[in-house]
UniProtKB/Swiss-Prot annotation:
Disrupted-gene phenotype: Flies that have reduced expression of all isoforms (transgenic RNA interference targeting the common C-terminal region) exhibit severe muscle degeneration in larvae and adult flies. Muscles were either ruptured, absent or the fibers were detached from their attachment sites at tendon cells. These are necrotic, not apoptotic processes.
Assembly and oligomerization: Component of the dystrophin associated protein complex (DAPC). Interacts with Dg, via the Dg WW domain binding sites.
Predominant place of localization: membrane
Annotated SUPFAM superfamilies: EF-hand, RING/U-box, Spectrin repeat, WW domain
Name of the protein this chain belongs to: Dystrophin, isoform B
GO biological process assignments: actin cytoskeleton organization; establishment of cell polarity; imaginal disc-derived wing vein morphogenesis; imaginal disc-derived wing vein specification; maintenance of presynaptic active zone structure; muscle cell cellular homeostasis; muscle cell development; muscle organ development
Record organism: Drosophila melanogaster
Subcellular localization(s) per the UniProt record: Cell membrane, Sarcolemma; Cytoplasm, Cytoskeleton
Gene3D superfamilies: 1.20.58.60, 2.20.70.10, 3.30.60.90, EF-hand (1.10.238.10)
Binding, Zn(2+) 2: C1299, C1302, H1321, H1325
Compositional bias segments (type: Polar residues): 53-62, 1497-1509, 1580-1611
Region named Disordered: 1-28, 43-243, 327-356, 389-417, 481-508, 827-851, 994-1024, 1488-1516, 1559-1669
Residue ranges covered by zinc fingers (ZZ-type): 1279-1335
């Protein structure tokens, strides 16, 4: 509940009184705060001194004291008045801006006196004012002027006139302060200032400050009427501080001031009345001695000049000084005349003074500090009074008046600006309630002051009689004084805060009385409002407490309601929910009374406080009531739902029993109806209607039962309910079948079934028409643009919609026909013609007609069913075909766009070619050309794809859009031009490089040594005569044996090394055999002396970081290897570099393209260098991981492919899963916890490092050779203090194998590798492998395990074989992942222009013919069976469902189906080409014989030796050149035929391998797959001994596959048992001529070779068919 906001503050209107003095003072007011405490102390000291003089004077008799001295105050008081504490600048709070209240001030005409009814006009002059002692006034003035504030603010101003003492009430003082801002405020009561000075002195003593001197204040009072408060002189200064501060703090200060006045009321009453009588009588007596005319005129003029107009400020100050002098003289005269007054007058005056000072002290609290003590700066006469009160209180009054007049003339009163006065007035009048009635037009502030004084006047009722005695004297004084004008009164009232000041001669009595009334009324209103606010606060607090309580309770109940959940379906849960609902509802009902109380509080606030804003209360109450209503309605609805659920559950059992009884009764009726159906057909109709009626009951019971079955928690109840439901369903279905059968029998008349037959025939015709329409829609070519395809899809949707509309009718007729023929006996399905031919329908019996009808219906049902199914299938196929065309067309257009951008980029690169100026630039441009070739290789693949897509569209009668065809044709042309341009560019660069090399006299090779440690050695010195090292255009080294005149890709040392590795083939187990071979290679290449950290640093130093997908050529590889080998001492650097390059090219670049991937280069070196095994695993994973340190399937496949190439080079790849890396990737992903569905779905999945390491710790089959290599290296120097039980070797060096079944049986590694056995030991026994010396703990452990194994039977070991590695099944797996070629993502270079490459291509097959080195069962040189299958899988086009072959059988079948026609076409082309060549050769021979018969013998001789034609003529030379070309062409043809024969042999070998795999039993899968031995996690060449002690080995579980034999032509292995001795021969021109005759002889056998190839292909087809079966 909030109170209404106060009205806004109206802007202050500036009048004429904004003179020159106002703007100077207003900004300086905030800066005088530091002087306020000092001013308060001065004022307090003055009052204390005055009080001391009064107390001293009170002890004497009244006639004894001097005239003009103030009457003494009572020596003691019953209760001390609290002092006003002095505040400093830091304690003062800035007064808030108080909005003004509307008030009216009635202005009076300027210059006219205000006439008060009942009072005589003011015509007399007031008595003269008593003069203060000069010393007192001067000391006060000096004290005030000594302040820096006083000197700053009141410089160059006249001194104020002498202050006139008067007895003013609190209302008069406040009114006078507000009406005259030029006057200084009066001093506070002495008791208050005494307390203030005491407090200030105590604080000063605490702070170490000197006490402030306290001047003695003096105040003169004038007599007034009885019941009226005297009005202060206009010379009195304005204001005190606490008026605004009290308003700022609110009603609290006012109540405190009123409480203090109530406490002092009893003491003040008598003293105040006596003081008023004596003081006012003396004023009246003194007034009679004053002269009338001039003084009254001057006083009236002064009163008229007291307006707030700043233009008349100077005249007003002059009049003020004169008036003060006159009044001081009059007061002095009156005091002299009244010297004989009684002592009671002194007591009355003292009482009145105490009361007035107390009121002033109360009102001073309500003003700010800036105004509370501002009067003391300008009231210089206070110093004189203080001096008089402290030292000589008996000084003459005349001197005091004279001194005060003198000091007052030095400094005039401070003028204030109109803005500042208006601000003070607004702040003083702000908090007065506007309801106060202003009878005389006074401001609200005056009414408040009058109300307060009225309350004080009631306490002085006892002094009313004494005050009446002095009324006459006061009336005479009032009659003698001049009246003020109405304009002056209006101006004074406008700037007043607490009370209105009138002159002494105005009718102030009536105004004061009204002020008292207004003050009482305002005080009463304020007190009422305060009480109302207290009550409002109390009610609001109760309301808020109740609201918070209810909101908390509602929130808890709402949460409880949300947790109730849905309605259950079981009895026990429903019962619990009902209890919960009832308790919830009961709690809602119990708390209803709290909401009633809350609503009562709300209504009370609204009714009791109608003038305040209660909108927020109403809204909060409505929200809470609405929440309660929602809760109540929700719980009632839930109760109804629970009741309905319970009722439904209870009625389910009854309904189930009733329905089962109905079924029993109906089944009995059906049995009876079957016999009596013909006599009483109406009985079946009633039965049928009853069954249809109970169909709804059955559906409801079945649905309810299923719901209950799903919600039951008890197993027994669920089983029982399931049985009842099954029984009900079965009996209902049987009843329906019986009903249908009876209905069919009733409807078995000819008309019904004839109508069914007719309907079936009509539907058949409709289906045939729709089939024809579908053929029309799908007939003809399909438009390949997107719009046409979308239109055809829309047509298909419309067509399918027609089929769906007809489907219910077709299925209904088919169902009826099948039911009819099912109930009839089986008859022959002869046609209608045959049936009519047998007999005429007119002579048929009813039984024969029924059989004929049945036969027709059966035939039509079968025909309609077949036609309908075919139509649906054709529609589905059309839809699938359109979707496929749409997808392929979009892909085709996308590839065209990509290809176009690639070709444009290549053409732009071509335009920037410049001729080379040096060898270095030629090499750099050659590298750029090579990169461009790589890019164009990808573009060529895309172009081939586009051409294949276009061929597919053409074959399927899909019209490709003309723009796409045009673009494809343009791209083909541009690609051919680019290829020609690149070939020409390569020739230019090669010629430039060769020319520069010849000029330099170099060996044909230039390298860049930047970034290496020292210059590169001359690698030509790596071989010794008769060998010579040469390089191709791609910097690929090859070696020439001048003794045998042959060339080799392998270094002579590498050939010897490979021959030496053949001796290790005697090792029985493939994992150890591979590890031994790799260890030999590692030592020969000195890679075991290069640490992995050195290799990684070298990679980074040469810029190979994050370049794994790029290519590295041989010069760069040489540079990196040189930086590694220079760190090793005592090696043949040139030989090591050549061997390392040779090994890496054999592993990763068998085609000798001269470039490999950076990833392959790094993997090949890291696998064989020295390092910790786990560190190698981590580094290998980092090579393929992305920025998030994760590797997907493709990256993992690339890594495993590069790793598997190492055993592949050694001919051991078949023992480790083959070249197919998909099973290993799948095994890794499954080990990482990825589901099989995610792997098969080709989702975007990846693994982290910990997954990869966890998989490798299980030692997978494809990488098991790597940890075995590390253990083998660690065991080379190990010596075991044991004796071999077979060869008796002691100590055992290397591996030590301890049998875990035979006690104290050890074997050395040699015996174990060769599979030797002892008498009692067998290969099936488990063994433990040690590569370091054993400990006693291990001995005890092995003995315990051996003891356990003694008690295990042979069946246990067969049932629990210990493979020792993680097997990977690869027989039934396809190559769905990327198995990159030797350079993935880059096609090998075509070195057609390289002489050595061409010679190698020709001679590789011719050498086989010459030496007969290859057998019929040899395998390919560069591919094993897995890689060949993988290549064919990638070459096969995708099937319609997008599934790739998963087994070798499927691969072979798909390969045969796709490649058969291609092979036959190649064979036919070769036969045709061979026939043409033979015909051309015969024609040439005939021409030569006819033209030169005498040289026929020479021609025959030339066929054997081309050197014999050197002396022939020009025509003979031409003929010889053509013959040479013909022979070369025949050689190429023969080589291609040989390749085809080799291809057929490859297929036969693969089929043989597949037959072996298919014939193997499932239990032998472990032996069919490869084998190896896993290592402990973290084993390495330099690992600690304790990491290599935990290997268990079973010899019978190890793979014993024989290794492939190496083909020495290119360093690869083949499965032929006999090594081939055929080498790559350099065929010169003379040698080609020498074998010409052999080629002529072999040309006649081309037809035979073709027949052999065809026969082999037929055999392959037959074998594939057998495998498929």
């Amino acid at each position: 509940m909030t109170a209404k906001p106060p009205p806004p503050i109206p802007p202050t209107l500036g009048g004429d009184d904004s003179g020159t003095h106002g703007p100077k003072l207003a900004p300086e007011i905030p800066r005088i705060n530091s002087e306020l405490a000092a001013q308060a102390a001065l004022r307090g000291q003055q009052l204390l001194r005055k009080q001391g003089s009064q107390e001293q004077h009170a002890t004497n008799t009244l006639p004894a004291h001097k005239t003009g001295a103030p009457p003494p105050l009572p020596p003691t008081q019953s209760r001390p008045v609290p002092a006003i504490p002095a505040r400093g600048a830091s304690d003062r709070a800035a007064p808030p801006e108080i909005p003004p209240k509307r008030h009216s001030l009635k202005s009076m005409p300027d210059g006219q006196p205000m006439m008060v009814p009942g009072l005589p006009p003011t015509m007399r002059q007031p008595p003269p004012l008593p003069r203060k002692p000069a010393s007192t006034q001067s000391s006060a003035q000096n004290s005030a002027q000594s302040s820096p504030l006083a000197g700053m603010k009141f410089k160059d101003k006249p001194p104020p006139p002498p202050e006139k003492h008067s007895t003013l009430s609190a209302e008069g003082m406040a009114a006078r302060r507000c009406s005259n801002p030029f006057e200084m405020p009066p001093p506070p009561p002495p008791l208050v200032l005494q307390s203030a000075v005491a407090a200030l002195s105590e604080q000063s003593s605490k702070n170490g400050l000197n006490p402030v001197p306290s001047p003695a204040p003096t105040r003169a009072s004038e007599a007034k009427k009885i019941n009226q408060r005297s009005i202060a002189s206009p010379t009195e200064e304005f204001g005190s501080e606490d008026a605004l501060r009290g308003i700022e703090s609110g009603l609290r200060n006012m109540e405190r001031a009123m409480q203090e006045q109530m406490n002092l009321r009893n003491m003040e009453a008598a003293v105040q009345n006596n003081f008023d009588l004596s003081f006012k009588a003396s004023l009246a007596a003194g007034a009679r001695h004053l002269g009338g005319g001039s003084v009254n005129l001057r006083t009236a003029n002064y009163e008229r000049n007291l307006s707030l107009d700043e233009g008349r400020a100077g005249d007003s100050r002059q009049s003020l000084e004169e008036l003060k002098q006159l009044r001081a003289q009059a007061q002095q005269q009156s005091l002299l005349n009244n010297s004989s007054s009684s002592s009671s007058n002194s007591q009355v005056e003292q009482s009145m003074r105490s009361t007035i000072e107390h009121h002033m002290r109360s009102l001073d609290r309500n003003l700010p500090l800036e105004l509370q003590y501002s009067r003391h700066r300008f009231q210089n006469n206070l110093n004189a009074v203080a001096a008089a009160g402290g030292g000589g209180g008996n000084s003459s009054t005349g001197n005091a008046v004279a001194n005060s007049g003198t000091s007052g003339s030095q400094q005039p009163p401070m003028p204030l600006s109109s803005e500042f006065r208006e601000q003070i007035r607004q702040q003083l009048l702000g908090n007065i309630p506007p309801q106060v009635v202003h009878n005389m037009g006074q401001s609200p502030g005056s009414a408040a002051a009058a109300a307060l004084l009225q309350h004080q006047a009631q306490s002085r009722a006892a002094a009313a009689a004494a005050a009446a005695a002095a009324a006459a004297a006061a009336a005479q004084v009032a009659a003698g004084s001049g009246a003020l004008s109405r304009e002056e009164l209006r101006m004074r009232r406008r700037s007043s805060h607490d009370e209105t000041q009138l002159t002494q001669n105005s009718s102030g009595g009536i105004q004061v009385t009204r002020l008292r009334e207004h003050w009482d009324e305002t005080s009463q209103c304020v007190l009422q409002r305060a009480a109302q606010l207290k009550n409002m606060l109390s009610d609001s607090q109760r309301f808020e407490a109740k609201r918070l309580e209810l909101e908390k309770w509602l929130a808890r109940m709402e949460q409880r309601a949300e947790r109730m959940g849905t309605i259950a379906t079981t009895a026990d849960i429903l019962e619990a929910q009902q209890k919960e609902q009832k308790s919830f509802h009961a709690e809602l009902h119990q708390n209803k009374q709290h909401f009633d109380i809350f609503n009562e509080l709300t209504q009370k606030l609204i009714a009791v406080y109608p003038n305040d804003d209660t909108t927020r209360i109403k809204k909060m109450t409505e929200v809470i009531n609405q929440r309660y209503a929602n809760l109540n309605s929700g719980v009632i609805n839930r109760g109804k739902q629970l009741h309905a659920a319970v009722h439904s559950l209870q009625s389910f059992d009854r309904a189930m029993d009733q329905f089962l009884a109905f079924l029993s009764e109906t089944e009995t009726l059906c049995e009876n109806a079957e016999s009596d159906i013909e006599r009483n057909p109406l009985m079946f109709k009633d039965l049928q209607s009853e069954i249809e009626t109970h169909r709804v009951v059955y559906d409801r019971l079945d649905g309810t039962g299923r719901k209950l079955l799903g919600s039951l928690t008890s197993q027994e109840d669920a089983v029982m309910l399931q049985r009842r439901l099954d029984e009900m369903n079965q009996r209902w279905n049987n009843l329906k079948s019986k009903s249908i059968a009876i209905r069919n029998r009733l409807e078995s008349n000819s008309e019904h079934w004839n109508a069914l037959l007719l309907s079936l025939r009509e539907l058949t015709e409709w289906v045939i028409r729709k089939d024809t329409e579908l053929s029309t829609l799908g007939l003809g070519p399909v438009r390949g643009d997107a719009v046409s395809l979308q239109k055809q899809l829309d047509d298909h949707k419309a067509f399918r919609r027609q089929l769906e509309d007809k489907r219910p009718i077709v299925e209904s007729n088919l169902t009826s026909g099948r039911q009819y023929i099912a109930n009839e006996a089986a008859v022959s399905d002869t046609s209608d013609t045959e049936a009519n031919h047998d007999s005429d329908s007119r002579y048929m019996s009813a039984e024969e007609q029924s059989r004929e009808l049945t036969r027709s219906i059966r035939r039509e049902v079968g025909k309609l069913s077949e036609q309908w199914n075919n139509l649906i299938d054709r529609s589905d196929n059309w839809k699938h075909r359109l979707d496929e065309y749409m997808t392929k067309m979009r892909q085709f257009q996308k590839i065209l766009e990509d290809l176009s951008s690639r070709v444009a980029l290549a053409e732009q690169t071509k335009t920037s070619w410049l001729p080379p100026s040096s060898v270095g630039e030629a090499n750099e441009q050659m590298q750029q050309l090579q990169r461009l070739r790589d890019k164009m290789t990808t573009a060529s693949a895309l172009l081939d794809d586009c051409n294949e897509q276009q061929s597919f569209f053409t074959a399927n009668q899909v019209l490709v859009p003309t723009p796409c065809l045009s673009k494809l044709e343009d791209l083909n042309t541009r690609m051919k031009l680019l290829q020609i341009a690149m070939d020409e560019r390569q020739k230019v660069l090669c010629q430039a490089g060769a020319q520069q090399t010849h000029e330099n006299g170099d060996d044909g090779r230039t390298t860049s040594n930047s970034g290496t440690i020292g210059p590169l050695p001359n690698l030509g010195q790596s071989v010794k005569p008769p060998w010579e090292r040469a390089t191709t255009a791609a910097n690929v080294p090859y070696y020439i044996d001048h003794e045998r005149e042959t060339t080799h890709w392998d270094h002579p040392e590498m050939i010897e090394l490979m021959k030496g590795l053949a001796d290790l083939n005697e090792i029985r187990f493939s994992a150890y055999r591979t590890a031994m071979k790799l260890r030999s290679v590692q030592k020969r290449l000195a890679l075991d002396r290069i640490s992995m950290s050195t290799a990684c640093e070298s990679f980074d130093r040469h810029g190979l970081r994050a370049q794994n997908d790029k290519l590295i050529d041989i010069p760069d590889m040489t540079t990196v290897l040189h930086s590694l080998y220079v760190t090793i001492d005592k090696i043949d650097l040139t030989l090591m570099l050549d061997l390392a390059i040779n090994w890496i090219l054999n592993v990763y670049d068998s085609q000798r393209t001269g470039q490999i991937r950076v990833l392959s280069f790094k993997v090949g070196l890291v696998l064989l260098c020295k390092g910790h095994l786990e560190e190698k695993y981590r580094y290998l994973f980092r090579l393929v991981a992305d920025t998030d340190r994760r590797a997907d399937q493709r990256r993992l496949g690339l890594l495993l492919h590069d790793c598997i190439q190492v055993p592949r080079q050694l001919g051991e790849v078949a023992a480790f899963g083959g070249s197919n890396i998909e099973p290993s990737v799948r095994s890794c992903l499954e080990q990482a916890g990825i589901s099989q569905e995610a792997i098969d779905g080709n989702q975007d999945i990846s693994i982290e490092l910990q997954h990869f390491l966890g998989w490798l710790q299980h030692e997978p089959q494809s990488l098991v050779w790597l940890p075995v290599l590390h253990r083998l290296a660690a065991a080379e120097a190990a010596k075991h203090q044991a004796k071999c039980n077979i060869c008796k070797e002691y100590p055992i060096v290397g591996f030590r194998y301890r049998c875990l079944k035979c006690f104290n049986f050890d074997m050395c590694q040699k015996c174990f590798f060769f599979g030797r056995n002892a008498k009692n030991h067998k290969l099936t026994h488990p063994m433990h492998e040690y590569c370091t010396t054993t400990t006693s703990t291990e001995d005890v452990r092995d003995f315990t395990r051996a003891l356990k194994n003694k008690f295990k039977s042979r069946k246990y070991f067969k049932k629990h074989p210990r493979v020792g590695y993680l097997p990977v099944q690869s027989v039934l797996e396809g190559d769905a992942l990327e198995s990159p070629a030797p350079s993935p993502q880059h096609t090998t270079h075509q070195l057609q222009n390289d002489m050595h490459s061409r010679l190698e291509m020709y001679a590789s097959r011719l050498a086989q013919v010459e030496y007969g080195g290859t057998g019929s069962n040899s395998t390919p040189d560069s591919d094993d069976e897995h890689q060949l299958i993988a290549q064919y899988c990638q070459a096969l086009p995708g099937t319609s469902n997008g599934s790739a072959p998963k087994s070798p059988v499927q691969v072979m079948a798909a390969m045969d189906a796709e490649q058969r026609e291609e092979l036959e076409a190649i064979i036919r082309d070769l036969e045709e080409e061979n026939a043409n060549l033979q015909a051309e050769y015969q024609q040439l021979c005939s021409k030569e014989q006819s033209g030169m018969p005498e040289d026929s013998n020479g021609m025959q001789h030339s066929s054997s030796s081309m050197t014999g034609l050197s002396g022939q003529g020009e025509q003979g030379q031409d003929m010889m050149a053509e013959a040479k070309l013909l022979r070369q062409h025949k050689g190429r043809l023969e080589a291609r035929m040989q390749i085809l024969e080799d291809h057929n042999r490859q297929l036969e070998a693969q089929l043989q391998r597949l037959r072996q795999l298919l014939d193997e039993p499932n239990g032998g899968g472990s032996s069919a797959t490869s084998s190896g031995l896993p290592s402990a996690p973290g084993s390495a060449l330099n690992s600690k001994p304790n990491t290599l002690q935990t290997r268990s080995v079973t010899a019978s579980q190890l793979n014993t596959d024989s290794p492939a034999k190496m083909n020495q032509q290119n360093g690869h292995y083949e499965h032929n048992s006999k090594n081939s001795s055929g080498l790559v021969t350099v065929i010169t021109e003379q040698e080609l001529e020498s074998i010409n005759d052999d080629l002529e002889d072999s040309s006649s056998s081309n037809t035979t070779n073709t027949t052999t190839t065809t026969t082999t292909t037929a055999t392959t087809e037959k074998t594939c068919v057998e495998l498929q079966k």
